[in-house]
From Swiss-Prot:
Organism listed in the record: Caenorhabditis elegans
Residues involved in Mn(2+) 2 binding: D90, N122, H172, H247
Changes seen on gene knockout: No obvious phenotype. Simultaneous RNAi-mediated knockdown of gsp-3 and gsp-4 results in male sterility due to chromosome segregation defects during sperm meiosis. gsp-3 and gsp-4 double mutant hermaphrodites have egg laying defects and no viable progeny. gsp-3, gsp-4 and him-8 triple mutants have incomplete separation of sister chromatids during the second meiotic segregation. Mislocalization of MSP in activated sperm. In addition, have partial reduction in mpk-1 phosphorylation and air-2 association with bivalent chromosomes in the most proximal oocyte in response to MSP.
Active site, UniProt feature: H123
Catalysis: reaction(s): O-phospho-L-seryl-[protein] + H2O = L-seryl-[protein] + phosphate; O-phospho-L-threonyl-[protein] + H2O = L-threonyl-[protein] + phosphate
Protein's job: Probable phosphatase which plays a redundant role with gsp-4 in spermatogenesis by regulating sister chromatid segregation during meiosis. In addition, involved in sperm motility by controlling the dynamic disassembly of major sperm proteins (MSP) in the spermatozoan pseudopodium.
Keyword Manganese in record: yes
Protein localization: Chromosome; Cell projection, Pseudopodium; Cytoplasm
4Fe-4S found in the keyword field: no
GO molecular function annotation: metal ion binding; protein serine/threonine phosphatase activity
Record-stated family: Belongs to the PPP phosphatase family.
Name of the protein described by the UniProt record: Serine/threonine-protein phosphatase PP1-gamma
Amino acid sequence: MTAPMDVDNLMSRLLNVGMSGGRLTTSVNEQELQTCCAVAKSVFASQASLLEVEPPIIVCGDIHGQYSDLLRIFDKNGFPPDVNFLFLGDYVDRGRQNIETICLMLCFKIKYPENFFMLRGNHECPAINRVYGFYEECNRRYKSTRLWSIFQDTFNWMPLCGLIGSRILCMHGGLSPHLQTLDQLRQLPRPQDPPNPSIGIDLLWADPDQWVKGWQANTRGVSYVFGQDVVADVCSRLDIDLVARAHQVVQDGYEFFASKKMVTIFSAPHYCGQFDNSAATMKVDENMVCTFVMYKPTPKSMRRG
């Protein structure tokens, strides 16, 4: 039986940790995190595998545990439910505050299920976040591998794709050679850790490549890279105008491909503390016009740790 959840109280403590630099483990206990996962899982399960949402909405790319940068996005655009958001995955790994990041987002999902949408990224898969930081953080901060496992159960229910105003198809990674119709996306099974190969794996892992025509094996060792011709074909076949995806660091936070039929959005500035990239978010207004907000890396003197 899941313990009752006071989502407002948990959100205020998570936000206070972000604003004050307080310690998460003294503010939020493991049972509360487990309850948050369980409640969020039921919300994901109640919604479709292809999230069909209407504008206006803000689309955000990778966050990777950069909690203060997530808060910058809300400060700049507003908080739900005043503003609608669609995040394209990769909430955990690499950054320093993975647990704060994913839990605040799950709280927003629970409290505002029709205003706040989260797709799954490849880092919301156990084989990846076991290695790239999230497992270690759960273990170090809460001394709990069970907590990590409970997060995986929630991640397995996350949708893999979204459709804004019937015209903008969104996913974390990219397209699939097996994708022929939107109904295939509506029928993607959950819960699951997508098998390799599958449409699900491609949605999480595939990348555009300006030097490729058609499909080629991806140097990541998973899925494919695809050319501009593929994007044009898919937009025509699915009757869409734009594909929005994340998954790759781009210098200005956003980058177009295939005559502006695809855009990559990356929302973690100064990624990993090693890149000097800006971040960006994409606003889709009521008329389906897309504009971008950029977030410069914060000066070194302002960065925590």
